[in-house]
């Protein structure tokens, strides 16, 4: 039997070393590749239902009172679709990092965090197509390096498990936009922000569906639908 192909859509928030933000979030929404078209169609149908154009790009930063019900419904769509899952890593405080101690650059650490996020998803009986929304100019280098790191770390030397790591722009992928929404909520909560009632309402919907601490504490290992790791550096190595 052919193995299962999983599409993984990754996004990142505040990942640069000196960007002025304390926290950083990486997140991935993933599903079987053969479900992607149907799920994307449901996403576009939801946009139409709320009077939005199908090509409207969903983003955490675009949440407004007028669109709050759409974004809350989108959380419900994600929650109700058994084929869609989320895995995230929250780094609450980048300022505690001291890469010199561990003889690594910020980029080395960045790939390590991506591996930490993705390794829980990578099963030997499946193959993975990983799509990254990389927002800086070094995207091509980062995708190549991440592919190498992932394959080496799981001993996938012929790249039969991690078949593909490539860039995609978020406006080209509905599922990537869901990742943006979820990591935006995690980042907002981690900074204790409350200025936008609409954003707080969307966060409340996430908590109602996945638990009050879903976006602020490490999930149990058995949480497969919505899984978050809150990462802090250890004394013996990052």
Regions found by a protein language model. Give the residues of each.
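Phosphate-ester processing/binding pockets and catalytic centers
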Residues: 1-238
């Amino acid at each position: 039997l052919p193995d299962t192909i999983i599409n993984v859509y990754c996004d990142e928030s505040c990942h640069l070393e000196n960007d002025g933000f304390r926290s950083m979030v990486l997140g991935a929404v993933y599903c079987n590749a053969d479900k992607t078209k149907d799920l994307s169609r449901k996403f576009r149908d939801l946009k139409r239902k709320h009077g939005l154009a199908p090509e409207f790009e969903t983003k955490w930063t675009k949440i407004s009172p007028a669109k709050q019900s759409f974004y809350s419904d989108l959380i419900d769509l994600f929650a109700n679709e058994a084929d869609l899952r989320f895995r995230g890593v929250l780094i609450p405080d980048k300022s505690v990092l001291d890469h010199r101690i561990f003889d690594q650059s910020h980029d080395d650490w960045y790939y390590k965090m991506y591996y930490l996020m993705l390794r829980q998803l990578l099963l030997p009986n499946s193959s993975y197509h990983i799509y990254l929304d990389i927002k800086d100019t070094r995207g091509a280098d980062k995708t190549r390096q991440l592919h190498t790191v992932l394959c080496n770390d799981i001993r996938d030397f012929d790249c039969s498990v991690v078949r593909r790591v490539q860039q995609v722009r978020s406006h080209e992928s509905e599922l990537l936009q869901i990742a943006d929404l979820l990591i935006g909520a995690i980042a907002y909560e981690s900074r204790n922000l409350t200025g936008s009632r609409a954003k707080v309402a969307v966060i409340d919907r996430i908590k109602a569906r996945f638990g009050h601490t879903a976006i602020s504490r490490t999930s149990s290992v058995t949480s497969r639908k919505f899984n978050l790791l809150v990462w802090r550096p250890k004394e013996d190595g990052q």
